[in-house]
């Protein structure tokens, strides 16, 4: 295999899946410095063609960025070497998954598109979609061998299928972290929030077939007029509109509702932000999710703040919106 991971080498995905794992497995690994769309939007596909890359590992945000530049760009390159296109870092929304299958796998390749879920703390994937499994839109996959994952309530009771709750891991697994360096009590906290389990801090749903949907961080859940709404749900609704390439939402304090929603939307090429489009997007969210999830305001910035690995930094958007300290920006994409 010729393996291309688009992460920054300083992140756990980078040093684990650019350096350690490929070399341990005897795989040729390709890595480059800079954003995945620099110096031009087609650079990723140019590299796949030039080096006959067989496996690509990237973030869903990168897929949505590729979508922004249209379906025709990847078709200009020979991508027949691709056999696996996999994502991690945040939920892979159905539109992005379908685009990858339609545009990448419909471009002369037989590539399998897969999602997976893990954290820095777990050291490697815990949920995933193997090539022998059917990929399901917006689902990270099933618990991988050696991992006992469950969706539970605050007391640790297992939730029924298709009911949201906290994602926990019940037993130690081969690649888990064993402590927080210099702060063992902090490590113990994650094993004490839910009895007899490691609490990941993510909210998830498990269906009747054992497929997990990771909705987002527990602290990314908005509380609008007493309704708990996942940021990923609102972002997914926005991205499902044909004019939208990427979206990020935050909660703002509201004296009446507790919080209201502000959305930041990156439009696809050929679309321009306007009050008319804002109204159309609000109507679209109302149709998809209901009136309670409609953003109070939609902004159309030129770009969203991201880490070098492609994750949107929502805390920065919120800090800027509320006039707070933006904190550590050392991982910010240049």
Please report, for each region that a protein language model flagged, where it lies by residue.
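Conserved AMP-binding/adenylation subdomain of ANL enzymes
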Residues: 1-5, 9-54, 68-69
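Conserved ATP/PPi-binding loop(s) of AMP-dependent carboxylate-activating enzymes
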Residues: 142-146, 157-190, 229, 325, ...
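Acidic-histidine catalytic/liganding microenvironments
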Residues: 69, 184, 194, 241-242
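Gly/Ser/Thr-rich phosphate-binding loop
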Residues: 1-3, 20, 24-27, 54-58, ...
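Glycine-centered tight turns that cap/initiate beta-strands
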Residues: 81, 146, 243-246, 291, ...
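Active-site glycine-centered loops adjacent to acidic/histidine catalytic or metal-binding residues
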Residues: 89, 118, 141, 202, ...
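AMP-binding/adenylate-forming catalytic core of the ANL superfamily
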Residues: 49, 56, 173-174, 178-179, ...
């Amino acid at each position: 295999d010729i393996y291309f991971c688009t992460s920054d080498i300083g992140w756990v995905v980078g040093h684990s899946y650019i350096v350690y794992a490929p070399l341990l497995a005897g795989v040729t690994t390709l890595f480059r410095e800079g954003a995945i769309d620099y110096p031009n939007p087609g650079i990723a596909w140019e590299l796949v063609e030039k080096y006959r890359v067989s496996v690509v590992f990237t973030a869903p945000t990168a897929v949505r960025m590729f979508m922004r530049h249209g379906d025709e760009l990847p078709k200009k390159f020979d991508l027949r070497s691709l056999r696996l296109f996999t994502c991690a870092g945040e939920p892979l929304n159905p539109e992005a998954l379908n685009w990858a299958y339609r545009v990448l796998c419909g471009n002369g390749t037989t590539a399998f598109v897969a999602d997976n879920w893990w954290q820095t703390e777990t050291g490697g994937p815990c949920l995933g979609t193997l090539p022998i499994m059917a990929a399901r839109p917006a689902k990270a996959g099933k618990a991988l061998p050696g991992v006992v994952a469950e969706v539970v309530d605050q007391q640790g009771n297992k939730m029924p299928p298709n009911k949201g709750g906290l994602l926990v891991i019940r037993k130690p697994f081969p690649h888990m972290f064993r402590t927080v360096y210099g702060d063992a009590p902090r490590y113990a906290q994650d094993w004490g929030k839910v009895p007899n389990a490691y609490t990941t801090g993510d909210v998830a749903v498990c269906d009747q077939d054992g497929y997990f949907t990771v909705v987002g961080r527990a602290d990314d859940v908005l509380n609008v007029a007493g309704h708990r709404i996942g940021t990923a749900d609102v972002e997914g609704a926005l991205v499902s509109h044909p004019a939208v390439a990427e979206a990020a939402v935050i909660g703002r304090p509201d004296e009446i509702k507790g919080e209201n929603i502000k959305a930041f939307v990156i439009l696809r090429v050929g679309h321009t932000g306007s009050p008319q489009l804002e109204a159309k997007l609000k109507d679209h969210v109302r149709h998809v999710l209901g009136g309670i999830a409609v953003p109070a305001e939609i902004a159309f910035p030129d770009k969203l703040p991201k880490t070098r690995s492609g994750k949107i930094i929502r805390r920065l958007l919120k800090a800027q919106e509320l006039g707070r300290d933006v904190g550590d920006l050392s991982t910010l994409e240049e």
